[in-house]
Amino acid sequence: MTELPDNTRWQLWIVAFGFFMQSLDTTIVNTALPSMAKSLGESPLHMHMVVVSYVLTVAVMLPASGWLADKIGVRNIFFAAIVLFTLGSLFCALSGTLNQLVLARVLQGVGGAMMVPVGRLTVMKIVPRAQYMAAMTFVTLPGQIGPLLGPALGGVLVEYASWHWIFLINIPVGIVGAMATFMLMPNYIIETRRFDLPGFLLLAIGMAVLTLALDGSKSMGISPWTLAGLAAGGAAAILLYLFHAKKNSGALFSLRLFRTPTFSLGLLGSFAGRIGSGMLPFMTPVFLQIGLGFSPFHAGLMMIPMVLGSMGMKRIVVQIVNRFGYRRVLVATTLGLALVSLLFMSVALLGWYYLLPLVLLLQGMVNSARFSSMNTLTLKDLPDTLASSGNSLLSMIMQLSMSIGVTIAGMLLGMFGQQHIGIDSSATHHVFMYTWLCMAVIIALPAIIFARVPNDTQQNMVISRRKRSL
């Protein structure tokens, strides 16, 4: 890093800043949801749409971000990403209704979807290959700090100011970041293949409509027949994409990806696995505040051990997988995460609050080992010619499954809690207990998929992707 020119180091700082903004926003909002609900006159049971709208938008827009950067230029797209994210933050702070807030989060999600992948692409273009790993480590470090600061910072802002400030703080830093991007970042443009617009639209419609159908009856009052029509339309869009990809060699995601067994199995497991684990960051701060009566700041502090556990486990997960293999690690961590989530609920309802940080630390460790293993299992055997496409599809599936997870969590809360629940009451405890029991079952189910992973304790066990050919 020290051998790089000053202008390149400044460009890396800009990318790191973008990573920090995006990662901070993924965790800072969850702590503020109960306060948002009170301010907007909504039930806390409906506030999951604030999270779903952002994550689903990121999932939909991810496939287009790399192509746009190549076609229009990395500086132009990164600048646009920061501007859209900042404008979305402003509109979030100005929102007076839940629907306005959801629409503003969609705009924020468009910017967030482009920020991280375009940032990675920028590093690839400005840094010599020999220093790429060091540069990526540098720019992703702020992205790891964001989730650590987010819950506590969100709690402080909500408790001592108002929830609007979790969005307003993005505005000055966004302005500085946009100006620095425009002045300092080069605008690399390369020849690229034609964008698969029909495939992109089919996938986008399918993902959005299916998620809406899953949640529409509770939060939007859509009739069952309309929901059935939406579900059928979403499924039809996905099936049409598969037909399109089979006939079109330039499809957004080639079906040749699924000729690699570990990719197919890993992608299915990642999708199912992240539905369950995607519920936890949303449900935990909501339960601590609504179910147990914690203050926003206290609830935010309680999330820090989970992030620390996740960061610490990343240092040893390679050795664990090398020792036990993917199948054993994935099955054990999947079942372990379900048990730890039940342990968290039990400890909380028994009033043993002093044990909650330890349980959340353990939850973060187990979840991190599971995430790392799922990601590398999915990509490790792909041919080099399909590696980039496979990684993009995995990133999209990760965001989609997390949005579905939050949607299901909100749906479960609504089903058990009907319309309104009080803070720290016996009835509220029962609502969260039933919801958590269902969540534990959903978290555990992907173990059935991971049990089909080949026994790899003697081969293909290192978390790295070797060179492959078609």
UniProtKB/Swiss-Prot annotation:
Periplasmic side: 1-11, 70-76, 125-137, 186-196, 246-262, 307-341, 417-430
PROSITE patterns (alphabetical): MFS (PS50850)
CDD domains, A to Z: MFS_LmrB_MDR_like
Topology class, membrane: Multi-pass membrane protein
Transmembrane segments: 12-32, 49-69, 77-97, 102-124, 138-158, 165-185, 197-217, 225-245, 263-283, 286-306, 342-362, 396-416, 431-451
Main location: membrane
Listed GO MF terms: transmembrane transporter activity
Localization: Cell inner membrane
GO terms of biological process kind: transmembrane transport
Any GO CC annotation of this UniProt entry: plasma membrane
SUPFAM superfamilies noted in UniProt: MFS general substrate transporter (SSF103473)
Protein name, UniProt field: Putative multidrug resistance protein MdtD
Keywords for the protein's UniProt record, in alphabetical order: Cell inner membrane, Cell membrane, Membrane, Transmembrane, Transmembrane helix, Transport
Gene from which the chain derives: mdtD
Family affiliation: Belongs to the major facilitator superfamily. TCR/Tet family.
